[in-house]
Each structure stands twice: as structure tokens, then as C-alpha cells.
Amino acid sequence: MGRDTIAEIITSIRNADMDRKRVVRIASTNITENIVQILLREGFIENVRKHRENNKYFLVLTLRYRRNRKRPYRNILNLKRISRPGLRIYSNYQRIPRILGGMGIVILSTSRGIMTDREARLEGIGGEILCYIW
């Protein structure tokens, strides 16, 4: 049975966010690097570093928190894996769902790489819906 690396990074980020940890370490693959770059560009994470340990590469993510008077509160509210190895979900560009009326993002795997729902609509291409973030 193969590993679902997308589900692993979503679970790692969600668990660290719920436990209010600022740093998350995940395994580095091409897919995880592309997803992390989208999260960085959209402002859900603050910083990314590539770390090498025993000939294996890891990504070290710094989560973004907003501060108020009492304590820091979370920036990422929810992450949800949609298409999984046992049930793939595909969509054309016209039927890509809008999360919270456009406030959240959908990450898609397309023929032109991994991108957000806004980028896919602008380019007029659909693909596999990987996850929702809102």
C-alpha cells in the first residue's frame, strides 16, 4: 500500500495548528513542495526551509499566527483532503467549487502543474481536486 503524502502534510499542518505549534516538519517531494509554495503564496504559512538529514530532505514550515492581546490565534481554519487514492475527484474549470464564496482556496492538480482554483479558472483548465483550505 502506498503512502498518501498529500494527506500526511494536511494532517501534519492541521495537528500543529490545533496544538498551536509554529513549526512543522514534513517529507519533501515534488508534490509537497508545490503545495507548500501555494500555501506560502496565499499567506497561510510564513516561511519554508529545505532541510537535509541522513540523505533525506524535509521541509520545515513556519505557520502564520495573528496576535491579539490575550494570545495568538490561528490563521488556518480548516484543511480537507478531497481526492484520495481510493476515490479520485475531477472537475472541469467551470465546475470547480468556490469555498466560502471565494474566501477559501481549492488546490488542483492539472496538466500544467499544481495550482489554485483561481489560477485554473483564469487558464481555463480543470483537473483533480486535491484539497480545500478555508
Swiss-Prot record:
The Gene Ontology biological process annotation of the record reads: translation
Report if keyword rRNA-binding is assigned: yes
Q: Which GO terms describe its cellular component?
A: chloroplast; ribonucleoprotein complex; ribosome
One Pfam annotation, family name?
A: Ribosomal_S8
Q: Recite the UniProt keywords alphabetically.
A: Chloroplast, Plastid, Ribonucleoprotein, Ribosomal protein, RNA-binding, rRNA-binding
The superkingdom listed in its UniProt entry is Eukaryota
Chief localization class?
plastid
Q: Which InterPro entries match?
A: Ribosomal_uS8 (IPR000630), Ribosomal_uS8_CS (IPR047863), Ribosomal_uS8_sf (IPR035987)
Q: Name one GO molecular function term.
A: structural constituent of ribosome
Subcellular location per the Swiss-Prot or TrEMBL entry: Plastid, Chloroplast
Q: Provide the assembly information.
A: Part of the 30S ribosomal subunit.
Please explain the role this protein plays, according to its UniProt record. One of the primary rRNA binding proteins, it binds directly to 16S rRNA central domain where it helps coordinate assembly of the platform of the 30S subunit.
Family, per entry: Belongs to the universal ribosomal protein uS8 family.
Q: What is this protein called?
A: Small ribosomal subunit protein uS8c
Source organism (scientific name): Nicotiana tomentosiformis (Tobacco)
Which gene underlies this protein? rps8
